[in-house]
Amino acid sequence: MIIMTILSLLLSNAVTLRRDISILFNRIVIIALIYCILHDTMSLSIISKGVGLHGGLLHITNITQVFQIFIFLISILILQLTSFDPIKKFYIMRHPRFINKWPRAIGYSIPLSSIQAVLKDYLFKIQGFNKEHLKIIEYPLILLFVICGAVFLMSTNDLVSIFLSIELQSYGLYILSTIYRNSELSTTGGLIYFLLGGFSSCFILLGASLLYANSGTTSLDGLYIINSISDVNDNMTSWYKSYYLNFSLLIFSVGFLFKVSAAPFHFWSPDVYDAIPTIVTTFVAIIAKISIFILLLELVYHTNNYLSEFSWIYGLLVSSFLSLIIGTVVGLTQFRIKRLLAYSTISHLGFILLALSVSTQSVESTQAFIFYLIQYSFSNLNVFIILITIGFSLYGYVWNNKEYKNLLDINNSPVQLISQLKGYFYLNPLLSLSLAITIFSFAGIPPLVGFFAKQMVLSAALDNGYIFLSLIAILTSVVGAVYYLNIIKEIFFYSPGHKLKTVDVENTWPFPVKRDLKLNDSNAFSISYDRYTVSSPLSSGYTISSPFSITISIITIVILLFIFMNKEWLSMGTIMVQVLFST
C-alpha cells in the first residue's frame, strides 16, 4: 500500500504545479496509512512466530508488525499538522455587536459571509500568518520514503538490506530538513545533518564489512548461528572468533548510535534540531529512533555473549552512562527551546540504552525497554505539537525585546527561546497545562506515565546488578528536573511579554468607504469609518482547529491518567515481550 501511494504521488507531482493541493496529498497519505494499520492489525494473528520474505531478506514477526503499526500511528499524528488549517476561526466573526453594527457603519448591505472572508484574509496578512508548510507538495511523498525505510529496517534480516534501509530512511530525513528552500537556516541544518549522517553510515558499512569478513555471510540468521556456536564451544579458536564478531558488532552499533544522537556521538543533534523547522524536527526526533532501536533490540537479543570476556553490549552501557551525564549537565545551560529538547532526548536515550543493554537478561527488562520507547515517543510528539500550536497562536503578537526581533527563520520556527513562553498561561491556560503535564512526565513526576517508565527501567537494572548506572540515572533525573521546572516557571510565574499587533490598513480596503482596521492593545478588534466605529473583543486572537486540539487532548489525557489504566498498557507490553521471547 505504501509503494502504491508513493507511485501515485510521484505521478501526481509530475502532472501538476499547483502548490495549494499539498493538503489534499497529506490527507491521501493519512488514509493510506490508516489502511496499512488495519491491514497489519488483521495479520497479527496470521504471522505467529514469523514469516520470511524475499529469500530471507526480510523477517516479519509480531513484534515488527506491532511497531510498524506504531510508526504508522505516529506518522499520521505528525501528518495532520500539515493536513488541516491550524486556525479554525476568529472570535470576531460571530460576535453580535459586530454583526449588528456593520450595516450602519458601511451604509449598504453586503453579505456577512463576504465580510467575514475579507476580514479573515486581512487578519492573516496583518498578523503575518505563514502557510508555507501547507504548500510543499513533496512533503508527504518524502515522508512515505522515510516510513518505508523505517519499516524495512525493522524487518530486515540481512546486512545489505540493513544498509539500504537505513540509507533510505536517512536520505528522506536529509531532504526533509532542507525542504524549506527559502530558509537559509534550514539549509544549513540539513547540510550538517547530511554530512554527519553520511559519516555515521561509514561506521555501519565498515561494521557490516567486518561481520561479513569474519563470518562469511550477510544473513543475520547465519550470524546468530555462529554466535551461538561460539557460546557453547570453549576452545580458544571459538573464543577468538567470538571476539572479532563482537568487535565488528561494536563498530556496527556506533553508526546507529550516531543516527539516534546518543552520547558521545550527539554533537550534531542540538544544532540540527534548532536549525530545521519545528514540524520537520518532530519527524526527525521520533521516527528515526524507533526503527533503529527495534533493530538493535533484535541484535542484542540474539548476539549477547554470556561466555565471552568481551561483548559489544558494553559499548551500549558506556553510551548510556555518557548520555545520562551529558544530556543532563549540558541541558542546564540551554536557553533555546529546541536545543533543550535535544539534550533532553539525549538524557532519555540513556534510559533507553540502559534498558536495551539488560533486555536479554529478563523479560521485565525487555518490557521496560519497549514501554519506555513507546511512552517517550508519545510524550515527545505531544511536546512538539504543543510548541507548533503555540507558535501558530502567537502569530498575532509582538515582543518588545530586541532579542526576539533578531531571531532567524521566525516563520518556520516561531517559538525558539524559552523566554518566548513567558506568561503564556495567561493567554491560553489549557494549552499551558497540557505542556506542563508533558514536561512533568519527562521529569518523571508521579503519577504520570514517565515516572512508571523510569521506575521500570531502574527496577530492571537493579535486578540485574547495574547498581552504579542506576544511581547515575536517579541523580541525573533529579538534576534534569531543574531545566524542566525552568520552562514551567516561565509559563506560569511571569506576566505575558506579548502584545497584540496594531495595524492600520490604507487604500486597499475593498469597500468604498473610509476605513481604519486595527488590532489594538485592549484585546479588541475595531473598524472606524466616517461616523461609526465597529468594535468587538478578540479574546485570544486565534482559535486552534479541532485536529490539533483533539490530538493534544488525547495524548495529554493518556499521560495524565495512566495510573488508572496501567494494567492495559503493561499487559500489552508483557504480551509483546512474550512474543519476542517465544520466537
UniProtKB/Swiss-Prot annotation:
| Protein EC | 7.1.1.2
Top enzyme category: translocase
Q: Which biological process annotations from GO are given for this protein? A: ATP synthesis coupled electron transport
Please verify whether the record's keywords include Mitochondrion.
yes
Q: What reaction does this catalyse?
A: a ubiquinone + NADH + 5 H(+)(in) = a ubiquinol + NAD(+) + 4 H(+)(out)
GO (cellular component) term, any one: mitochondrial inner membrane
Q: Name one Pfam family in it.
A: Proton_antipo_M
Report the function annotation for this chain.
Core subunit of the mitochondrial membrane respiratory chain NADH dehydrogenase (Complex I) that is believed to belong to the minimal assembly required for catalysis. Complex I functions in the transfer of electrons from NADH to the respiratory chain. The immediate electron acceptor for the enzyme is believed to be ubiquinone.
Return the similarity comment.
Belongs to the complex I subunit 2 family.
- Provide the protein name: NADH-ubiquinone oxidoreductase chain 2
Q: What is the lineage of its organism?
A: Eukaryota, Fungi, Dikarya, Ascomycota, Pezizomycotina
By which gene is this protein encoded? ndh-2
